[in-house]
Amino acid sequence: STGLPTRTQQGDLLSTAFLSHGDTAHPVLLPGSVEECFTFGHQAFDLAERLQAPLFVLSDLDLGMNQWMAEPFEYPDRPMDRGKVLDGEALARLGGFARYRDVDGDGICWRTLPGTDHPRAAYFTRGTGHDEAAAYSERADVYERNLARLARKLEGARTLLPGLVVAGEGAEVGVI
């Protein structure tokens, strides 16, 4: 789209943040400069892996249509943060593996990656109604526990995301 559809609106933010079936939300990064576009772009990959969730970076007409001066960007000199990943050796040490068990209490569960060489590495998840072992369930208590876990994960995500920028202290008018 061009013109009015490219201007950021509250509806864009709400649609992106709550883009899903059911009661869930997703982190959204809103860059305010070309430097932040670059930085948030590569941070989004790490955060999406760590949180095991879609993470969105929204740009708008102002950033996309104007010419900006910027210092050369520095690429990260660290490996990608894959988050809580169990390999075959870790699975062998565990008594059992439940894909959606919140071991650490932060809402982010340990996971395996495709190709992990261990018989307990694979799992199948059907929909949002599942128990800790990824088995399908429509039981209210199971769904309530899952929603509570997702709420803990989203709350913890706030500490991982870039902080808000507040400028113009003492101003009579604020723009959000």
Regions found by a protein language model. Name each.
Residues 1-23, 76, 80:
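Flexible glycine/proline-rich, aromatic-decorated loop/lid segments
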Residues 1, 33-35, 61-64:
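Acidic, glycine-rich active-site loops and adjacent beta-strand->loop/helix elements
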Residues 1, 30, 176:
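A short, small-residue-rich loop immediately preceding and capping a beta-strand
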Residues 9-12, 25, 157-162:
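Glycine-rich, flexible loop/turn motifs
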Residues 23-46:
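Active-site/ligand-binding-proximal alpha/beta "capping" segment
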Residues 40, 45-176:
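Flexible, low-complexity linker and terminal segments
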